[in-house]
A protein has these predicted regions:
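A glycine-rich, aromatic-flanked flexible loop/lid motif
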Residues: 233-245, 272-288
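Metal-dependent active-site segment of extracytoplasmic phospho-/sulfohydrolases and closely related
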Residues: 9-18, 294
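Extended, H/D-rich, highly charged conserved domains that either
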Residues: 162-163, 170-237
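Active-site nucleophile/metal-coordination loop of metallo-enzymes that catalyze phosphate/sulfate
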Residues: 3-5, 15-163, 167-170, 195, ...
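Short amphipathic alpha-helices and their capping/turn segments at secondary-structure boundaries
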Residues: 1-5, 138-140, 175-184, 221-228, ...
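Conserved small/polar residues in nucleotide/adenosyl-binding loops
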Residues: 291-298
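Functional beta-strand-loop-alpha-helix junction segments that form "active/interaction loops"
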Residues: 235-264
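Active-site regions of oxyanion-processing enzymes, predominantly non-cytosolic
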Residues: 146-149, 190-192, 264-284
Length: 299
């Protein structure tokens, strides 16, 4: 008789890829292969992932002596765009016909002016930037003026960074809610993200108080189907935010991948049915640049 599967663990290693997609040139990603390129610099052991078949898909360096015991394969995204919302939605069954809007030159002046009117103060930035770079560059001016830092990326995001001692986290969240009403619900931008940080100039550090505001999924997802059939969904990490909380019975927000793995371990011991959907984001948040190769490997 076929075996019945009562629970599934779906774990996303955020930004950990094994090769470019056919549309890579559209995003300047030709030749990308996070694990493949890393393995050319530092051979990767990864015994568990090897046993599940990962090195049948990408060379991890060293000898392959572990026969695969799991099913393995590559996924290719059908939706246009490459942001977190698009990818996670597609994993749950929603294929977008049009990408979320992006702003490679920053947001139009009238959008920023309206945002500033809504929050009652000016803002800094309005550029495409990495989060760590822009708080290093504009953080001191932000601390002097009290103006939040606004930036975007290649993704459809409106990100607001603020020092927790300058703009308290609840106030930053209120700013993000105002921005989400304007650019999310009003313009279709995929996410508004609160990016609080602490520290002094030269040693700023982003905190675990990040919060994502995402659009409601544009159609029924697998999460909705599972919920309708009384199969509980546990969301770990930023997953709840990416689906605007829809179809999720319980959520565990985490401040690090260590906390995420602890939550997964706890679910292994206590959850008997349904879907446990986790995102481990530290690879993307902390280790995505070339100078962090060894940290990425050890993580």
């Amino acid at each position: 008789m076929p075996q019945t599967i009562s629970r599934v663990f779906l774990i996303v290693l955020d930004s950990v890829g094994i090769g470019e997609l056919p549309d890579a040139a559209r995003y300047g990603d030709e030749g990308s292969s996070t694990l493949g390129n890393l393995a050319r610099e530092i051979p990767l052991r990864l015994p568990t992932l090897r046993s599940l078949g990962l090195d049948q898909l990408v060379s991890l360096g060293g000898a392959n002596t572990i026969p695969p015991v799991g099913a393995y394969g590559r996924l290719a995204e059908r939706s246009p765009g490459k942001d977190s919302v698009t990818g996670h939605w597609e994993l749950m069954g929603i294929v977008l016909e049009q990408p979320f809007p992006t702003f490679p030159s920053g947001f139009p002046p009238e959008v920023i002016a309206e945002f500033e009117r809504r929050i009652g103060r000016g803002s800094l930035g309005n550029v495409v930037a990495s989060g760590t770079e822009i708080i290093d560059r504009l953080g001191p001016l932000h601390m002097e003026t009290g103006k939040p830092i606004v930036y975007t990326s290649a993704d459809s995001v409106f990100q607001i960074a603020a020092h927790e001692e300058v703009i308290p986290v609840p106030e930053l969240y209120r700013m993000c809610e105002a921005a989400f009403e304007q650019v999310g619900k009003g313009m279709g931008v995929g996410r508004v993200i609160a990016r609080p940080f602490v520290g002094q100039p030269g040693s700023f550090k982003r905190t675990a108080n990040r919060h994502d505001y995402a659009l409601d999924p544009m159609g029924e997802t697998l999460l909705d189907v599972l919920t309708r059939h009384s199969l509980p969904v546990l969301a770990i990490g930023k997953v709840q935010d990416l689906f605007a909380g829809r179809g999720i019975a319980q959520a565990v927000h985490t401040g690090s991948d260590a906390e995420g793995m602890d939550a997964i371990d706890a679910a292994c011991r206590s959850v008997t049915s349904g879907l446990d959907f986790a995102n481990l984001v530290d690879f993307d948040v902390h280790y995505r640049s070339e100078e962090h190769t060894s940290e990425f490997q050890s993580h």
